[in-house]
Structure formats: structure tokens, C-alpha cells
């Protein structure tokens, strides 16, 4: 596998991203557990077939991503923004691969170490408390599920170049991300970016995901192609996110007293506003969730 030439990373930029991620994901593991399913997965589930439970649908989402990667036993999978470790565990147990996870959350790092240590396997498992900017080891495949929102538009070219260069000629990657639309796209679909919508998006990227910026699906495709990837038609998961958000909101609401006890009423209200608001805007087709697959030339041939 080819190693890429290192590009210096700004210490200030890296430190800021650490602070942004920890501001959200290190609120309290006990708090997130009050509305997440037992997989501790914090991203859009995949309800196919529709009668799946949330836990089953989260595994279906993980499998949907992994199945697009053509993983073989003994390969090494890099999980960028690995959350609480469910995707890595699934990959090891189901596909017999080595895994490396990247996270900027201290809480997630600690839990991932426990999850990976509990797997009965001889495969290599490691989780690193660092960003993709500082990672340059060769890997065979890459998965990134709803971490892309944290990367920043100005870093997309660097991200895709780095991912392209650390994979072999037949490398594959999936990136799943919440997305917004350009005002021109909304106008073409008979939608209008209202002040209320813009204010809610600002609320998300300042109070829920500090430093975050939603891409458009077109940006995800264009920057990937610019780096050399072939990008098949992206998959919209919007209906699945509506259902995921509704379940999360209902579950957190039913655990209101416990949520306030482990955090505060302000945190509870902020997350209820986030979950209910996102459900509304996904339903209204103002937001979407895209699963995009990236193929290097050897995989696209």
C-alpha cells in the first residue's frame, strides 16, 4: 500500500476539533444511553425490513456500510469517527478483519477499548484518540458513519486525498452523513430556506455539534471524485432517519427525570429540541442523510 506525503496539521485546528467533539460526545455516557439502543449507535438506522427494532436496524445500517466495502478476512478496516465501537465489533465478528478506530472523544475511546478487548479473536484491534488528519497508516478499507459533519468544508479535499492515498488500488470507502441543500436546490424542489430553518441549522452546529457544518450530497461526490474516486449513485436514508429520530425522541422523553438527574434540565431540553427539530426538518425534506460509496480505480474496474 502507498503511504501519502504528510501535510502539516495545525495544532490549533486539531485542538479545536478535540474541544468541539468533547463538548458533545463527552456530555455523559449515561445520558446517551437513555435514548440509544443497546448497540450504543448514534447515527441513522436502516429499517429494512420496516418491522425491525431500533437495535436490529442499527445492525442493518452497519451491515449496509460494511457490505459495500468487499471486505475479506485479514484485511484492515479503518473506522473514522468510530463512536462507541459497534461497527468495529461487527466487522471483526462477522467478517474476520483487523480494525482501527479513530475518535476525538475520551468517553468513546474508553468504551471502545472495552468493547474491542471483549472480542474473542486473534485479529488486531485498536482505537486511537486522534483525528484523521494525524493518521497515515496503510489500510485496506475505510468506513465513516456520521463523522463527516464535523470535518469542515475547507478540509474536504485533504480528507479525501488522505483516504485515497492510504488505501490500495482496489480500495473502497463509505461515508454516511447528514446533509443540507443549497438554496438553489431547494428552490428547484419547491422549497424555500426560511429564517426558522436557518436558525435551527445554526442551533445544531453551535449548541449540539459545535464547529460542525453540514455538507450537501453534491459536495460529498465532487470532492471525492476530485481526489480520484469513482462515486456510484448515493443512497438517501431520509425515511430511515425520520424513524430513528422519532424513536430517540420518544425514548428520551420517557426518561426525562433520569436525563435531568444525570445532566441537567437545560441539557435535556436542548437535546429534545434537537431530536424533535431534526425529525421535523427531515420529514419536511429540508435535511437528508446520504450514504456515499467511494471506489479507487481497481475497485471500479
Swiss-Prot record:
It comes from the Bacteria. Coiled coil: none annotated. The active site is at 278. Keywords: Lipid biosynthesis, Lipid metabolism, Methyltransferase, S-adenosyl-L-methionine, Transferase. One of its GO terms (molecular function) is methyltransferase activity. Pathway: Lipid metabolism; mycolic acid biosynthesis. InterPro entries: CFA/CMAS (IPR050723), CMAS (IPR003333), CMAS_actinobact (IPR047672), SAM-dependent_MTases_sf (IPR029063). The keyword Methyltransferase applies. One of its GO terms (biological process) is methylation. S-adenosyl-L-methionine binds at residues 42-43, 81-83, 103-108, 132-133, 145. The keyword Nucleotide-binding does not apply. Its EC number is 2.1.1.-. Belongs to the CFA/CMAS family. Monomer. PANTHER family: CYCLOPROPANE-FATTY-ACYL-PHOSPHOLIPID SYNTHASE. Involved in the biosynthesis of hydroxymycolate, a common precursor of oxygenated mycolic acids (methoxymycolate and ketomycolate). Probably transfers a methyl group from the S-adenosylmethionine (SAM) cofactor and, subsequently or simultaneously, a water molecule onto the double bound of ethylene substrates, leading to the formation of the hydroxylated product at the distal position. This is Hydroxymycolate synthase MmaA4. It comes from Mycobacterium bovis (strain ATCC BAA-935 / AF2122/97).
Amino acid at each position: 500500500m502507498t503511504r501519502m506525503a504528510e501535510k502539516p496539521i495545525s495544532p490549533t485546528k486539531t485542538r479545536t476539533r478535540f474541544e468541539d467533539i468533547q463538548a458533545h460526545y463527552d456530555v455523559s455516557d449515561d445520558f446517551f444511553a437513555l435514548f440509544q439502543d443497546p448497540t450504543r449507535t448514534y447515527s441513522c438506522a436502516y429499517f429494512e425490513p420496516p418491522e425491525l427494532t431500533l437495535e436490529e436496524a442499527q445492525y442493518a445500517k452497519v451491515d449496509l456500510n460494511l457490505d459495500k466495502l468487499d471486505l475479506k478476512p485479514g484485511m484492515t478496516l479503518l473506522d473514522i469517527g468510530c463512536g462507541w465501537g459497534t461497527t468495529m465489533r461487527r466487522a471483526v465478528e462477522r467478517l474476520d478483519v483487523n480494525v482501527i478506530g479513530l475518535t476525538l472523544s475520551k468517553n468513546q475511546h474508553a468504551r471502545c477499548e472495552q468493547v474491542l478487548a471483549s472480542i474473542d479473536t486473534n485479529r488486531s484491534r485498536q482505537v486511537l484518540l486522534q483525528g484523521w488528519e494525524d493518521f497515515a497508516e496503510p489500510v485496506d478499507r475505510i468506513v465513516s458513519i456520521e463523522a463527516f459533519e464535523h470535518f469542515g468544508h475547507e478540509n474536504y479535499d485533504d480528507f479525501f486525498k488522505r483516504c485515497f492515498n492510504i488505501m490500495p488500488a482496489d480500495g473502497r470507502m463509505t461515508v454516511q452523513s447528514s446533509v443540507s441543500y443549497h438554496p438553489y436546490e431547494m428552490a428547484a424542489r419547491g422549497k424555500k430556506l426560511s429564517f426558522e430553518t436557518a436558525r435551527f441549522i445554526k442551533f445544531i452546529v453551535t449548541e449540539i455539534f459545535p464547529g460542525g457544518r453540514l455538507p450537501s450530497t453534491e459536495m460529498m461526490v465532487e470532492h471525492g471524485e476530485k481526489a480520484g474516486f469513482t462515486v456510484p449513485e448515493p443512497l438517501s436514508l431520509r425515511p430511515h432517519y425520520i424513524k430513528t429520530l422519532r424513536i430517540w425522541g420518544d425514548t428520551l422523553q420517557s426518561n426525562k427525570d433520569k436525563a435531568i438527574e444525570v445532566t441537567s434540565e437545560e441539557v435535556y431540553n436542548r437535546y429534545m429540541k434537537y431530536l424533535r427539530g431534526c425529525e421535523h426538518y427531515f420529514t419536511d425534506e429540508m435535511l437528508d442523510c446520504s450514504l456515499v460509496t467511494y471506489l479507487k480505480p481497481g475497485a471500479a474496474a
